[in-house]
Amino acid sequence: MAQKIQAIRGMNDYLPADTRVWQKIENTLKQILAGYGFSEIRTPIVEHTPLFQRAIGEVTDVVEKEMYTFTDRGEDAQSLTLRPENTAGCVRAGIEHGLLYNQEQRLWYLGPMFRYERPQKGRYRQFHQLGAEVFGLQGPDIDAELIMLTARWWKALGIAEHVTLELNSIGSLEARAKYREALVAFLEQHVDQLDEDCKRRMYSNPLRVLDSKNPEIQTLLNDAPELFDYLDDESREHFDGLCALLDAVGITYRVNQRLVRGLDYYNRTVFEWVTSALGSQGTVCAGGRYDGLVKQLGGHPTPAVGFAMGMERMILLVQAVNPEFVADTHVADVYLASFGDNSQSAALMLAEEIRDQLPTLRLMTNHGKGNFKKQLGRADKHGAKIALILGEDEINAGTVAVKDLRSGEQTIVSRSELAQQLTLLLG
């Protein structure tokens, strides 16, 4: 027997029982996005490597350790990367196709991303993100509306009581530069207390030290200078405006001054929705403002704000805290059973007639042999509520036997009345 080939570690198959849950959650989220005026954008999963180096930052963990990068074939031999996130791709597409200059755009995307990480529950090497990006608006009101949108998601999924909003402002580029100097000076005074990861980041990306998961580092940081003390007036006013809007609509939040996010393009507002229901993988949705990224990637200066949510982690959370959120496991509403030498072609023709009249009906026809009991067993297995029975007698008479599998009642109807009868029985 030939050796079996398995999926790559950290890259998962999603089988029909899984995808039904995915589809139900995706449809819920997409409907809410449409209600806020968002349109879908689809970008390639492979981009030129410099896009992510310039957007995310050369000294971030994503660029240094986690990207899947390879050299393309051909004479050009360009460096390409499987996308680790899609904000950069959206910005690249917006600039390339002229969507952003002097325009307001509200875009959403859904698709696979790739990062080389240690696989664990809720963290995979291929994972899926649903994200939303808004271009052309710079006030705190759009930041607030994006957060309101996500809060509406949580209510629709039945998880609102299990997520907490954390907020921070990381200010302008100039404010962060001043704070960076103060933070590095503090870290230099305590370098003997830093772990190796923080020592590595101390000069290359010191704000990420604030994000350390090491409890001893977090204790040390209690005495560190605070970013809020270095905020410029505009950033402080923006953040105060955002908090006031969230207070007005009743969205509770916690200001977390150590929340900095792992990507270099953020400025001013950053936020995360976190949960304690998934162990160490606590962040389910995160985002913020990135007003300088469009210019940085070659476009005109354009304010922007957005977020992304990991679908795998969200699905784990929904399944953990809201068992009533169940996807429909039935694949058929109606099952067409047929008997007799000439019944197969007649059954296929009848099925197509029904689909023409009732295009949203889920109809399965029996294929292969099987007596009456066996075919009704297949109907039940597929979750059908109605069985249509077509034999030689029904074919000759131009009728169909309709059996309600819930009540057991069976009636004979003409083919011309069949669609109306099915509509009546299925509500």
UniProtKB/Swiss-Prot annotation:
Catalytic activity: tRNA(His) + L-histidine + ATP = L-histidyl-tRNA(His) + AMP + diphosphate + H(+)
Keywords, ordered alphabetically: Aminoacyl-tRNA synthetase, ATP-binding, Cytoplasm, Ligase, Nucleotide-binding, Protein biosynthesis
Major place of residence: cytoplasm
NCBIfam families: hisS
GO molecular function: ATP binding; histidine-tRNA ligase activity
Assembly information from the UniProt record: Homodimer.
GO cellular component assignments: cytoplasm
Family to which the UniProt record says this protein belongs: Belongs to the class-II aminoacyl-tRNA synthetase family.
EC number in record: 6.1.1.21
GO biological process per UniProt: histidyl-tRNA aminoacylation
Record localization: Cytoplasm
Organism expressing this protein natively: Proteus mirabilis (strain HI4320)
Protein name, as recorded: Histidine--tRNA ligase
